[in-house]
Amino acid sequence: MALRMWASSTANALRLSSATRPHYSPLSRCFSSVLDGLKYANSHEWVKHEGSVATVGITDHAQDHLGEVVFVDLPEAGGSVTKATGFGAVESVKATSDVNSPISGEIVEVNSKLSETPGLINSSPYEDGWMIKVKPSNPSELDSLMGAKEYT
């Protein structure tokens, strides 16, 4: 009788513990988050186009692979960027990675908070961790970028 009670309670405990664990498919992508309304480059940068300005940053997937970001090198406002060309770099405890611009245009603003707090790229890649704001010189370049469904 005692053995049956022990077996029953063990089986129940196993059922409960496996029911609360999330299931991850080995075929699923490991992107932490992909947001609708943004455009994505194959090189893992994102663009949010609002009016005449496009905000650019690196994706959650990119920051996750880099690890803890410790330094960000960005250009100055007033300069220009060219699609598929590097405009800055992100240094982490693991590696340094160039950041490519997904669009061409004039840099109208740089996120100065990143010089003091580069970890914003890790904690908030789509909000506080944005890198530059660009006035696109060729807005049709946005059409060649991926939406959220294509990126995942």
Curated annotation (Swiss-Prot):
Q: What is its main location?
A: mitochondrion
Q: What are the recorded Gene Ontology BP terms?
A: glycine decarboxylation via glycine cleavage system
Q: Name one Pfam family in it.
A: GCV_H
UniProt keyword list: Lipoyl, Mitochondrion, Transit peptide
Cofactor(s) for this protein? (R)-lipoate
Boundaries of each Lipoyl-binding domain copy?
53-135
Q: Record keywords: Metal-binding included? A: no
Gene3D superfamilies given for it? 2.40.50.100
Location comes to:
Mitochondrion
Residues with N6-lipoyllysine modification: K94
Highest taxon in the source lineage: Eukaryota
Any idea which residues the transit peptide spans? 1-31
Is Metal-binding among this UniProt entry's keywords? no
Which CDD domains does the record match to this protein?
GCS_H
GO annotations of cellular component type: glycine cleavage complex; mitochondrion
Instruction: Note how many cofactor molecules are bound and how.
Output: Binds 1 lipoyl cofactor covalently.
Query: What functional role does this protein have?
Result: The glycine cleavage system catalyzes the degradation of glycine. The H protein shuttles the methylamine group of glycine from the P protein to the T protein.
HAMAP family recorded for this chain? GcvH (MF_00272)
Its family remark reads: Belongs to the GcvH family.
Q: Which NCBIfam families match?
A: gcvH, PRK01202.1
Q: How does it assemble?
A: The glycine cleavage system is composed of four proteins: P, T, L and H.
By what name is this protein known?
A: Glycine cleavage system H protein, mitochondrial
| The species this protein was found in | Flaveria pubescens
Native organism taxonomy: Eukaryota, Viridiplantae, Streptophyta, Embryophyta, Tracheophyta
Q: Which gene encodes it?
A: GDCSH
